[in-house]
Amino acid sequence: MAMTKTKELVSSNAVVVFSKTYCPYCTSVKKLLDQLGAKYKVVELDTESDGSEIQTALAEWTGQRTVPNVFIGGKHIGGCDSTTAKHSQGQLVPLLTEAGAV
């Protein structure tokens, strides 16, 4: 059930950030996306009733259990380091543009 919900969230939103409200790395990614003017869906796993199930589904699907877990245009980007690295390499804005998020 959680896997279906997770894949549905990813396929129906240009950008999805699976996050936790208290996570500083999640905050960094959300601030970066805000600065770029990107529209994105945040799923705060610590406030969702099925958050731990979604986190387990993400781990099974992507091999990444940690947050943030970022998807752009249906593609798994990774966590904070991967997202900020894509930005410093000039790859993030084109991905966001292609996905229709900016």
From Swiss-Prot:
User: Which locations, inside or outside the cell, does it occupy?
Assistant: Cytoplasm
Origin superkingdom: Eukaryota
Query: Which PROSITE patterns does this entry report, sorted A to Z?
Result: GLUTAREDOXIN_1 (PS00195), GLUTAREDOXIN_2 (PS51354)
* Name of the featured protein: Glutaredoxin
Q: Give disulfide pairs as residue numbers.
A: C23-C26
Its biological purpose: Has a glutathione-disulfide oxidoreductase activity in the presence of NADPH and glutathione reductase. Reduces low molecular weight disulfides and proteins.
The Gene Ontology CC terms held by the record are:
cytoplasm
Q: Which InterPro entries match?
A: GLR_AS, Glutaredoxin, Glutaredoxin_euk/vir, Glutaredoxin_subgr, Thioredoxin-like_sf
Glutaredoxin domain residues? 3-102
Similarity remark: Belongs to the glutaredoxin family. CPYC subfamily.
In its keyword annotation, does this UniProt entry include Cytoplasm? yes
| Lineage per the UniProt record | Eukaryota, Viridiplantae, Streptophyta, Embryophyta, Tracheophyta
* Keywords, alphabetical: Cytoplasm, Disulfide bond, Electron transport, Redox-active center, Transport
